[in-house]
């Protein structure tokens, strides 16, 4: 079973479902809608274009393995060339620098996160449960991709921004806007429903940023600083939920945690939206 689940994940990470825009990296079901998923059957690409797209996916996956083993700082074009079956010239046809490769990995990561967030939009619950569902999705993604989930910081460092291609920078910014727009819509819907109120100093922008900060910080520390005494003494598997609840209670986002069992919500999101990912994580003990 472990081998089977891992094989499924490797397949969709490698783009075997036909890869044009990486929308299906962590979606365990390749749907028929090619325009939506980027499936090869209706991608509209020529064989040569598809081969180029597939090769780029392969190179991104190799770069991902190198980063997981050695870290972002130790990634080089020479190492990527050695790990692949392609010449350095061919690799430079895809990426103008190692920073461009890093940005491609960050785009890969953000698209994967966006897929998880898209699932949570359809969760059957109140507005606060929907924001909790986003926290669940991000938590699961961070457990599956502890290295790539930190890309948000790496992608914004000057040494990456200065040397990455403008096209990839534009794509990353566009993706960020899409994710932010979805989060803004959720917050604004909560206000319209009467579950949340803005204050003169706090609007949707501040609330979205606060939730991202809680999610990113909590997961980054849990994944990368597990030996810290501050983290070791916390044995509760719902620690990320508690952090989110403290923020949301402080904002007065109803129902408050004293009025609703959000642990039950968290478990329901895992079961209804991410059962396959949870099953995989359990088999690899993460």
Where are these predicted regions, by residue range?
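C-terminal peripheral helix-coil segments that are non-catalytic and often amphipathic
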Residues: 3-43, 181, 185-193, 217-286
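Short glycine/proline-centered loop/turn elements that form peptide/ligand docking sites
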Residues: 30, 40-48, 65, 74-76, ...
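Alpha-helical structural segments
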Residues: 54, 58-65, 69, 83, ...
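Helix-turn-helix
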Residues: 70-100, 104
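Amphipathic alpha-helical packing segments from all-alpha helical-bundle domains
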Residues: 117-118, 163-195, 204-220, 237-245
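Amphipathic alpha-helical segments that line or abut small-molecule/effector binding pockets
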Residues: 128-147, 209, 241, 245
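Amphipathic alpha-helical segments used for helix-helix packing
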Residues: 144-167, 220-224
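Short, hydrophobic secondary-structure boundary micro-motifs
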Residues: 150-153, 198-200, 224, 257-260
């Amino acid at each position: 079973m472990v081998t089977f689940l891992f094989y499924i994940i490797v397949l969709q990470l490698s783009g075997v479902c036909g890869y044009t825009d990486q929308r299906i990296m962590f979606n365990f079901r390749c749907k028929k809608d090619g325009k939506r998923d980027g499936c090869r059957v209706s991608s509209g690409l020529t064989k040569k274009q598809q081969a180029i797209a597939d090769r780029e996916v392969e190179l991104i996956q190799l770069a991902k393995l190198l980063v997981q083993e050695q870290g972002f700082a130790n990634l080089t074009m020479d190492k990527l060339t050695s790990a692949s079956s392609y010449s350095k010239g061919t690799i430079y046809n895809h990426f103008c620098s190692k920073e461009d490769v890093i940005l491609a990995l960050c785009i890969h990561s953000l698209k994967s996160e966006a897929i998880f967030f898209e699932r949570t939009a359809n969760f059957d619950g109140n507005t606060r449960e929907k924001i909790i569902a986003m926290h669940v999705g991000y938590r699961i993604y961070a457990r599956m991709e502890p290295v790539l989930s930190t890309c948000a910081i790496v992608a914004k460092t000057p040494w990456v921004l200065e040397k990455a291609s403008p096209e990839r920078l534009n794509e990353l910014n566009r993706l960020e806007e899409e994710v932010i727009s979805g989060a803004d819509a959720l917050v604004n819907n909560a206000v319209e429903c009467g579950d949340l109120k803005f204050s003169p100093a706090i609007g949707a922008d501040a609330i979205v940023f606060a939730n991202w900060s809680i999610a990113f910080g909590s997961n980054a520390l849990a994944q990368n600083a597990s030996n810290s005494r501050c983290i070791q003494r916390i044995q509760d598997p719902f620690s990320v939920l508690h952090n989110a609840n403290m923020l949301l209670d402080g904002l007065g986002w109803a129902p408050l945690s004293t009025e609703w069992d959000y642990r039950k919500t968290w478990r329901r999101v895992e079961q209804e939206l991410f059962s396959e990912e949870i099953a995989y994580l359990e088999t690899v003990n993460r």
